[in-house]
Amino acid sequence: RSVSRGLGDVYKRQGKAFVSGVAGERFCVRNSGAVAVVEGVGDHGCEYMTGGTVVVLGQTGKNFAAGMTGGIAYVLDENWDFYQRVNKETVSLEPVEHKYDVATLKELIREHVELTGSPRGKEILDDFSEFLPKFKKVLPYDYDHMLRVIASMEERGLDGEQAQIEAFYAVQKNK
């Protein structure tokens, strides 16, 4: 495969990007809200990412998610060695198990196949139950904590925006 996208694609962008092929290094650097699906990335993918969602349907280079403070990445780890290439200082690696995550992942791959005709994406969709356990959810620790506090506020009856505001103050108070 050749590199089809280069340095800094999706840098500070919004919207969606679907790449049938492998991207170069620093794919989705400083992503602050875009959704991207790609079939592999070079070194430093999702570096300094603050928001958005990224799906990687293949290998990553080294130092994935360095400085990532927000957003979520789903990475296919067929060789069970992704942990060696991810920068674990600010993120955790989890299985993709929650129904929201499973639905999001599957829908983004479906959209990727529909828009790009990706054989790789189709292969994964056709055998999704076999591939699902091989995906890792990359989630920043602080972002995960904030999502949990927001959910707690919503359980107390606050609406979305008010729950976010109250969660922010609660987290700041406990620092």
Predicted regions and their residues:
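Single conserved hydrophobic/aromatic residue that forms the stacking wall/gate
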Residues: 1-11
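Alpha-helical scaffold domains
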Residues: 12, 31, 105-108
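Feature marks extracellular polysaccharide-active and adherence modules
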Residues: 20-22, 29-30, 38-39, 47, ...
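Short, glycine-/Ser/Thr-/acidic-enriched flexible segments
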Residues: 22-25, 41-43, 61-62, 79-81, ...
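Intrinsically disordered, low-complexity terminal regions
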Residues: 57-58, 65, 69-175
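Detector for repetitive beta-architecture
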Residues: 9, 14-16, 33-35, 46, ...
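Non-catalytic terminal/interface segments that mediate subunit docking, oligomerization
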Residues: 5, 15, 172-175
